[in-house]
UniProtKB/Swiss-Prot annotation:
Organism: Kineococcus radiotolerans (strain ATCC BAA-149 / DSM 14245 / SRS30216)
Lineage: Bacteria, Bacillati, Actinomycetota, Actinomycetes, Kineosporiales
EC number of the protein: 2.1.2.1
Gene3D superfamilies hit by this protein: Aspartate Aminotransferase, domain 1, Type I PLP-dependent aspartate aminotransferase-like (Major domain)
Function, in words: Catalyzes the reversible interconversion of serine and glycine with tetrahydrofolate (THF) serving as the one-carbon carrier. This reaction serves as the major source of one-carbon groups required for the biosynthesis of purines, thymidylate, methionine, and other important biomolecules. Also exhibits THF-independent aldolase activity toward beta-hydroxyamino acids, producing glycine and aldehydes, via a retro-aldol mechanism.
Residue sites binding (6S)-5,6,7,8-tetrahydrofolate per the record: 132, 136-138
Stated name of the protein: Serine hydroxymethyltransferase
């Protein structure tokens, strides 16, 4: 029989009852998910573990507050405390990335991209971005996405031999299509982009340059990846992934474009900001300015290079497995399975069987459908956050390599994964979040 909630608002009513009492089904979901995260190795490149401090801010009483507008210019009363939170988030973001202006209200990276486009171009204008099948993002011009429906899309791809972006090709496409906005950024590309070259091309064709640094923002914050801020007219990002903050968005720009960006976010794209998430962003930006965070990013890069090196070894190559571009400059490795007996779905399932979570991913010129694919995207941020160093990444890289070979011992590999999860407990003092 379903529990009946109290009908009168008393001190002992629903506002004071824990989740485990009010909704045991959802409490069970939280406990089960915490168990999954603790007992497996998370290697999806876009995922990370937010610090407990971020989780506390996001699950706070700021959830209750509406705050349409911006600090000091709200359309609601009672915003004096959330104004402080948003100012801290804006100031910390600007300092972290060396930007003149920051908007911390976007609900997601996609929202940030939509607002940035809305600020600089109009419906029907041309945009130029990395082709989705070659590592671009949905919001960079996919036909069924808002970006593909609203704008005239041209795309650049990667070289069929090197699988790298060729700036001469980008320039040629830009000169032919004359876009109003050029997008540099990616969702699945293992190398750094030349932001100065992108800006030069944008200037040549009279376009604005937008850089989507959602995946590598944490590396930029730590000084381990070139910053797009000096080159781009506008920079967008998520605050999770390598930044390990709440799932949300961020826009950085110059002071001359501040009003345009702010108006595009509110009221152009959104209503009230999620102030509990804004506060969590402020915490994440503070953490990202620490030496501990920089050290974690160094281990993230080191881990990705270790994984890439192991997956280029002769025994793995014999199984038809290769690494796109031969390595990585960032936090992820793209695995090409076109010559393997495994497709992307099968490889993902195999790693899941031994306790490693990755995602299947299309590779450039992929002959298989998107729900199957011929590749894997493997990332190291979450394991670096968990505390992994060179020795642990060497071990997990070997587990991955053995799991992708035709014959593998699932029980033995699962035991090796279990040993790693036990040695590096996740949220050890949390008990249950439910």
């Amino acid at each position: 029989m379903t529990d009946v909630l109290p009908t009168t608002p008393t001190a002992s009513g629903v506002t004071d009852r824990p989740l485990s009492e009010v909704d045991p089904e959802i409490a069970a979901v939280l406990d089960a998910e915490l168990g999954r995260q603790r007992d497996t190795l998370e290697m999806i490149a876009s995922e990370n573990f937010a610090p407990r401090s971020v989780l506390e801010a996001q699950g706070s009483v700021l959830t209750n507050k509406y705050a349409e507008g911006y600090p000091g210019k709200r359309y609601y009363g009672g915003c004096e405390h959330v104004d402080v939170a948003e100012e801290l988030a804006r100031t910390r973001a600007k300092e972290l990335f060396g930007a003149e202006h920051a908007n911390v209200q976007p609900h997601s990276g996609a929202s940030a991209n939509a607002a940035a486009m809305h600020a600089f171009i109009r419906g029907g204008d041309g945009i130029l971005g990395l082709e989705l099948a070659h590592g671009g993002h949905l919001t960079h011009g996919m036909k069924i996405n808002f970006s593909g429906r609203m704008y005239d899309v041209s795309s650049y791809g990667v070289d069929p031999q090197t699988f790298r972006v060729d700036m001469d090709v980008v320039r040629a496409v830009a000169l032919e299509s004359r876009p109003k906005l050029i997008i540099a950024g990616w969702s699945a590309y293992p190398r750094q982009l030349d932001f100065a070259a992108f800006r030069s091309i944008a200037d040549e064709v009279g376009a604005h340059l937008m850089v989507d640094m959602a995946h590598f923002a944490g590396l930029v914050a730590a000084g381990l990846h070139p910053s797009p801020v000096p080159h781009a007219h506008v920079v967008t990002s998520t605050v999770h992934k390598t930044l390990a903050g709440p799932r949300s968005g961020l826009i950085l720009t110059r002071q001359e474009f501040a009003k345009k960006i702010d108006s595009a976010v509110f009221p152009g794209q959104q209503g009230g900001p999620l102030m509990h998430v804004v506060a969590a962003k402020a915490v994440a930006f503070k953490v990202a300015g620490s030496e501990e965070f920089a050290e974690r990013q160094r281990r993230t890069l080191e881990g990705a290079k270790i994984v890439a090196e192991r997956l280029t070894a002769p025994d793995v190559a014999e199984a038809g497995v290769s690494v796109l571009t031969g390595g990585t400059d960032v936090h992820l490795v793209l695995v090409d399975l076109r010559d393997s007996k495994l497709d992307g779905q099968q490889a993902e399932d195999r790693l899941h069987e031994v306790g490693i979570t990755v995602n299947r991913n299309a590779v450039p010129f992929d002959p298989r459908p998107p729900m199957v694919t011929s590749g894997l995207r493997i990332g190291t941020p979450a394991l670096a956050t968990r505390g992994f160093g060179a020795a642990e990444f060497t071990e997990v890289a070997d587990v991955i390599a053995l799991a992708l070979k035709p014959e593998f011992d699932a029980d033995a590999l699962r035991a090796r994964v279990a040993k790693l999860t036990a040695e590096f407990p996740l949220y050890p003092s949390a008990g249950s979040f439910a």
